[in-house]
């Protein structure tokens, strides 16, 4: 048990909850139509593991004294074990969609395998050579975080069920949309073990509800589930100093409990 209590970064949720409309719709058909529009031109690029992360760490200072932000490897470690799905060819190259507005080549990363399969079907319609040599492959979020491909940006396609869950948790006046990949957290599930503190963050509302039912006696109305976006959490981790509380975040893969995930990490 720690002698001093660290601040829980998730309690400052006025900035954590997004209040603007989103490009991600809970209607899967609309999201697939959006993918079709981008898929007029397809390109391929190889996987590349870089030294710097795709999300730049922002240094902060107090009274002119440099401070240390969380390292890219520490942020990536928090993402270990969670897989997303994309489409690659037999050479292990991303199949990309090109923005017809003249922008970037975009790698699509799906939280559901079935969404990646739908993207693959569209890619095969657009390019003949992909009919036999393209496939859906998993890639872990820590690999995505450390991946640097020049000129390519990634777009996440969240689970539409979790978009719906996130909107239900938002205030009634702000349900027009949700920006980003929903993640869920509860102060009731923060774990303190020896000299460490762990703040589990879930990609599935059903998973966090299951955990709360096991470890707390709180009724459904008192479970204190908070919702934010993966992208926002990563930005805050990158900008935060050590011992700020953000280094305690650990992402729990969909379908896994905190205990199962920790066991998986020990085995690796």
UniProtKB/Swiss-Prot annotation:
It comes from the Eukaryota. GO terms for cellular component: chloroplast; chloroplast envelope; chloroplast intermembrane space; plasma membrane; plastid. It is found in: Plastid, Chloroplast intermembrane space. Disulfide bonds: none annotated. InterPro entries: Tic22, Tic22-like. GO terms for biological process: protein transport. Residues 1-59 form a transit peptide. It is a peripheral membrane protein. Keywords: Chloroplast, Membrane, Plastid, Protein transport, Transit peptide, Transport. Its main location: plastid. Belongs to the Tic22 family. NCBIfam families: 3a0901s06TIC22. Involved in protein precursor import into chloroplasts. Imported into the intermembrane space via the Toc translocon. May be involved in the import pathway used by proteins without a cleavable N-terminal pre-sequence. Part of the Tic complex. Interacts with OEP61 during its transport into the intermembrane space. This is Protein TIC 22, chloroplastic. It comes from Arabidopsis thaliana. The lineage of its organism: Eukaryota, Viridiplantae, Streptophyta, Embryophyta, Tracheophyta. The gene is TIC22.
């Amino acid at each position: 048990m720690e002698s001093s209590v660290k601040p829980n970064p998730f309690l400052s949720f006025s900035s954590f909850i997004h209040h603007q409309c989103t490009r991600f719709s809970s209607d899967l058909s609309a999201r697939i139509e959006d993918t079709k529009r981008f898929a007029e031109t397809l390109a391929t690029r190889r996987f590349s593991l870089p030294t710097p992360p795709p999300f730049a760490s922002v240094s902060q200072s107090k009274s002119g004294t440099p401070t240390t932000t969380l390292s890219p490897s520490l942020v990536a470690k928090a993402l270990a074990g969670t897989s997303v799905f994309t489409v690659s060819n037999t050479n292990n190259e991303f199949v990309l969609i090109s923005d017809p507005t003249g922008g970037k080549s975009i790698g699509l990363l799906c939280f559901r395998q079935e969404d990646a399969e739908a993207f693959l079907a569209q890619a095969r319609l657009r390019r003949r050579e992909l009919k036999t040599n393209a496939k859906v492959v998993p890639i872990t979020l820590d690999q995505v975080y450390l991946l640097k491909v020049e000129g390519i940006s990634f777009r996440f396609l969240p689970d539409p069920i979790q978009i719906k869950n996130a909107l239900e948790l938002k205030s009634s006046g702000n349900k027009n949309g949700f920006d980003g990949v929903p993640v869920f957290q509860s102060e009731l599930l923060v774990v303190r073990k020896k000299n460490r503190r762990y703040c589990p963050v879930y990609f599935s509302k059903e998973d966090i509800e299951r955990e709360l039912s096991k470890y707390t006696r709180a009724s459904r109305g008192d479970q204190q589930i908070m919702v934010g976006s993966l992208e926002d959490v990563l930005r805050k981790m990158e900008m935060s100093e050590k011992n700020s509380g953000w280094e305690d975040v650990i992402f729990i893969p969909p379908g896994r409990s905190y205990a199962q995930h920790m066991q998986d990490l020990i085995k690796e």
